[in-house]
Regions:
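Short beta-strand segments enriched in small/hydrophobic residues
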Residues: 31-39
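Positively charged, low-complexity intrinsically disordered leader regions
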Residues: 1-27
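Rossmann-fold NAD(P)-binding glycine/threonine-rich loop
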Residues: 104-121, 125, 228-281
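Short beta-strand elements in bilobed, periplasmic/extracellular small-molecule ligand-binding domains
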Residues: 55-69, 183-185
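Glycine-rich phosphate/diphosphate-binding loop of Rossmann-like nucleotide-binding domains
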Residues: 38-52, 134-223, 227, 232-248
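Anion-binding alpha/beta catalytic cores of soluble intermediary-metabolism enzymes, centered on
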Residues: 93-154
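Flexible, glycine/charged-enriched surface loops at secondary-structure junctions
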Residues: 25-32, 214
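Short, well-structured alpha-helical segments in soluble
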Residues: 75-87
Length: 282
């Protein structure tokens, strides 16, 4: 079974659009997301465009602020502080990666916790690990939504997450733990990785290496979630971190690239923007 993130996200966005349509009468306005793009990295431009299109579908106001790659760190932090104090702005997202002269950690810390739609602020991260209410990071949240939509029973399953980034690997391992899976986090220094992945009933791969996971690394009937977005060195086409063509016949459930986790990440960003809007109304 292939889980289409495109189809699931379209359904969820339609539901959100119906809800947001009632907001002007209820609250006087719709949620407002501000996206800051520094420089002209083609991948970043593409991601920002995707977020603007999704906002339009859902009915969220989207403002994209473009800044040159040579903007100073101080100028960028001052801009974020301005947006923090603007009551008409509900969500702030700074598209990563940033130029080397700007500290991503400082940028993330400067965004107000209440407007951190990415769920990257240290206080939101701490709340996640302490099982407190918080804004969940978009990709891990989208992965759990996809598993549930596909009817995958997470409780009691052996889950292996390859990748330990703060953006995907670590938070998705925590969300799987919260769903009562038994979770192992693997990484570049893991010994006997294939032996470990073959034990996985749920395998999440987020390492950014094209077709790294091969068919012999996956057990029959496994659920495979592919977070990677890469260029296939042979064809130049988009591909994931797993060899989809070889693994799809073995897997009980698998996500494609493109059209899998990516659309759900943007969908959950829309959800988080609405969530921040609602919390800030109280």
């Amino acid at each position: 079974m292939i889980i289409s993130g495109k189809e699931l996200s379209a359904k969820l966005k339609a539901e959100m659009a119906a809800r947001v349509a009632t907001f002007p009468e209820k609250y006087g306005r719709v949620p407002h997301l501000v996206v800051i793009l520094v420089g002209e990295d083609p991948a970043s431009v593409s991601y920002v465009t995707g977020k603007a299109k999704a906002s339009e579908v859902v009915g969220i106001k989207n403002t994209t602020i473009r800044k040159p790659a040579d903007i100073t760190e101080t100028e960028l932090l001052d801009l974020i502080r301005e947006l923090n104090s603007d009551d008409t702005v509900d969500g702030i997202l700074v598209q990563l990666p940033l130029p080397e002269h700007i500290s991503e950690a400082k940028v993330i810390e400067t965004i107000a916790k209440e407007k951190d739609v990415d769920g990257f602020h240290p206080l939101n991260v701490a709340a996640l690990w302490q099982k407190q209410e918080c804004v969940l990071p978009c990709t891990p949240k989208g992965i759990i939504r996809m598993l549930k939509a596909a009817g995958v029973e997470i409780k009691g399953k052996r889950a292996v997450v390859i990748g330990r980034s703060n953006i995907v690997g670590l938070p998705v391992s925590k969300l799987l733990l919260d769903e009562n899976a038994t979770v192992t986090v693997a990484h570049s220094r893991t010994a006997d990785l294939a032996e470990l992945t073959r034990q996985a009933e749920i395998l999440v791969v987020a390492i950014g290496r094209p077709k790294f996971v091969t068919a012999d690394m996956v057990s029959d009937g496994a659920v495979v979630i592919d977070v990677g977005v890469n260029r296939d060195p042979e064809t130049g086409k988009l591909c994931g971190d797993v060899d989809f063509a070889a693994i799809e016949p073995k897997a009980s459930v698998i996500t494609p690239v493109p059209g899998g986790v990516g659309p759900m990440t943007i969908c959950c960003l829309m959800e988080n923007t609405i969530e921040c809007f609602m919390k800030n109304r109280k």
